[in-house]
């Protein structure tokens, strides 16, 4: 017969959520930093095109 599982504690739930939030915060900071460097023209981490026409030509 099926038995209900025990409830997850608030501490465990909050710990898991904080790990997820820290990971998301790190990704957001990294993407913002990359966007700033692209706008300033100082990026060296990847190759990209400055012209929109080159992006969509197949």
UniProtKB/Swiss-Prot annotation:
GO terms for molecular function: structural constituent of ribosome. Keywords: Chloroplast, Plastid, Ribonucleoprotein, Ribosomal protein. Coiled coil: none annotated. It comes from the Eukaryota. GO terms for cellular component: chloroplast; large ribosomal subunit. One of its GO terms (biological process) is translation. InterPro entries: Ribosomal_bL32, Ribosomal_bL32_plant/cyanobact, Ribosomal_zn-bd. The keyword Plastid applies. It is found in: Plastid, Chloroplast. It holds the Pfam family Ribosomal_L32p. Residues 1-23 are annotated as: Disordered. SUPFAM superfamilies: Zn-binding ribosomal proteins (SSF57829). Belongs to the bacterial ribosomal protein bL32 family. HAMAP family: Ribosomal_bL32 (MF_00340). This is Large ribosomal subunit protein bL32c. The gene is rpl32-A.
């Amino acid at each position: 017969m099926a038995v209900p599982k025990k409830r997850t504690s608030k501490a465990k739930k909050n710990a898991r959520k904080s790990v997820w939030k820290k990971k998301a915060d790190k990704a957001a900071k990294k993407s913002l930093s990359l966007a700033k460097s692209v706008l300033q023209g100082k990026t060296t981490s990847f190759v990209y095109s400055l012209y929109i026409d080159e992006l969509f030509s197949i």
